[in-house]
């Protein structure tokens, strides 16, 4: 009887497990079908202004069965491909998650409907059941990131300045010139891509938001962007509304990294005063020592025109990262400041609003966390 009872309990448990698994699978399938229907409805609404749609078998042919992997990011894997007419493309295969669904629709709703010389073109897409992909124009030189954080100044100052100006023009178009204003929310070196001629194009609109022209701010439910490039008001709503000035802040941090040819936070800096580049650069500008100090750490010759470019990039960058968003210029104004036209950029006020200074606070934190931890001291 005891054995019979144990057997009955075991059978009952197994039956319950089977029922649970079926219900769980059914629930998961229902969720995925619901997501699929949502995306298909979205694509239906945008059909009249969409790039080309490809099937999954066509993607396999375009990428030679996904043979040439270009890179991998938070939302999926990117492969090199070739269209039938000979155009090279970058094919991003998105992972299966709610975040990738959101990125897919964001990219299609933004890049799929606009065109600008300094924005990466979305050439096509694929959506079949649980598989989704985006096809972009191929950018032969990859991201700006791999050129500004390396030993030996691969890009000359004139070329670097041209890249900064081109990226600024692309972002200004998003804010002020396209039919529906767009806030990118993830401006950083990794998302500035370079073609074979080093023409810069803003990429990765997975976090972007459309912004009505009649609105003075945008509502978001969570912080967006990459730490180190995120504007203060995105961390705390007490610091004011979220607007296109959040992109201006991110561009300012990018511009400072280009001017310094280093990350804004350098945990290996020989002096704590140099750990946070924006603060160090501000102090050097105040003392009139910026070009001299940057010459000391650069590996290429710097003429007077190069010095002017570095000085202008740094000043504009510091204007862009002002703590109060109202004190930051618009991206259209940033373009004008970089274009110069003989006008000097006025010295920016102190961008930071904290005591102790951000540099000293960051220095203590990062040295304890990284430097001391890595060296064992």
Q: What do these predicted ranges mean?
A:
Residues 201-204:
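Pre-DFG segment of protein kinase catalytic domains
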């Amino acid at each position: 009887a005891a054995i019979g009872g144990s057997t009955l309990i075991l059978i009952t448990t197994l039956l319950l497990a089977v029922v649970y698994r079926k219900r769980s699978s059914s629930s998961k399938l229902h969720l995925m079908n619901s997501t699929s229907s949502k995306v298909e409805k979205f694509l239906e609404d945008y059909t009249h202004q969409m790039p080309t749609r490809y099937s999954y078998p066509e993607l396999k042919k375009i990428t030679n069965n996904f043979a040439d992997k270009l890179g991998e990011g938070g939302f999926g894997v990117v492969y090199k491909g070739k269209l039938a007419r000979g155009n090279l493309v970058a094919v991003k295969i998105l992972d299966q998650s709610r975040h990738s669904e959101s990125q897919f629709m964001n990219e299609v709703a933004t890049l799929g409907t606009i065109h600008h010389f300094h924005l990466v073109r979305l050439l096509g897409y694929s959506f079949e059941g649980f598989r989704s992909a985006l096809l972009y124009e191929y950018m032969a030189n990859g991201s700006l990131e791999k050129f500004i954080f390396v030993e030996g100044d691969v890009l000359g100052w004139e070329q670097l300045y041209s890249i900064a100006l081109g990226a600024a023009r692309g972002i200004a178009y998003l804010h002020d010139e396209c039919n529906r204003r767009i806030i990118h929310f993830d401006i950083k070196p990794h998302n500035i891509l370079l073609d074979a001629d080093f023409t810069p194009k803003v990429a990765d609109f997975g976090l972007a938001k459309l912004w009505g022209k009649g609105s003075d701010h945008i509502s978001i439910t969570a912080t967006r962007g990459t730490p180190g490039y995120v504007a203060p008001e995105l961390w705390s709503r007490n610091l004011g509304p979220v607007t296109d000035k959040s992109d201006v802040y991110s561009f300012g941090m990018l511009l400072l990294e280009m001017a310094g040819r280093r990350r804004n936070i350098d945990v290996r800096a020989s002096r704590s005063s140099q750990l946070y580049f924006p603060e160090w650069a501000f102090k050097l500008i105040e003392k009139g020592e910026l070009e001299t100090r940057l010459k000391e750490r650069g590996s290429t010759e710097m003429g007077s025109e190069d010095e002017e470019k570095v000085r202008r990039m740094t000043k504009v960058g510091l204007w862009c990262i002002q703590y109060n968003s109202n004190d930051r210029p618009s991206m259209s104004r940033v373009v004008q400041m970089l274009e110069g036209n003989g006008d000097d950029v006025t010295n920016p006020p102190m961008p930071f609003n904290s005591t102790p200074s951000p540099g000293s606070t960051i220095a203590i934190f990062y040295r304890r966390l990284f430097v001391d931890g890595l060296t064992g001291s």
